[in-house]
A protein has these predicted regions:
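N-terminal low-complexity or simple alpha-helical regulatory segments
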Residues: 1-134
Length: 134
């Protein structure tokens, strides 16, 4: 099972590079540079998580217990929301940029959360963001 996980990690890493170079070109997001930036941030966070999973599974490094891992984990849901929201919402209904800064809160509190609380809480926050988008 570990071999399959490592194979999928490699696939997702190469897919992230292909997406970053092909889909997230400036020409594709002329009127939405914020969505492009959040998409690239989302890819970077997911890439960081996958590298951490590789280090844990293959190299036996305890990076999944690190503060950086928790920050990455808590940055995925807000980055996905801030990438998707401008694409799904008409420009007149979009929140002000200052209000969008509130979405940084999960990543900012992540370093101070113990791992036993942080991991389930990150998934709860992600689920709440998905409900918000629907």
């Amino acid at each position: 099972m570990t071999s399959l996980a490592l194979l999928l990690i490699g696939f997702s890493l190469f897919s992230a590079v292909v997406l970053a170079l092909s889909h997230f070109r400036p020409a594709n997001y002329v009127s939405q540079p914020g969505a492009r930036a959040m998409g690239l941030l989302l890819l970077a966070a997911l890439t960081g998580l996958q590298i951490t999973h590789f280090a844990w599974l293959h190299l036996d490094l305890p990076w999944i217990d690190s503060m950086a891992y928790r920050i990455l984990l808590f940055s995925v849901a807000p980055a996905f929301f801030m990438f998707s929201e401008p694409l799904l919402t008409p420009a007149a209904d979009q929140p002000k940029p200052l209000l969008m800064c509130c979405h940084l809160a999960p990543a900012l509190i992540a370093p101070w959360l113990p791992a036993a609380i942080a991991l389930p809480l990150a998934f709860v926050i992600g689920a709440l963001y998905l409900l918000w988008l629907t």
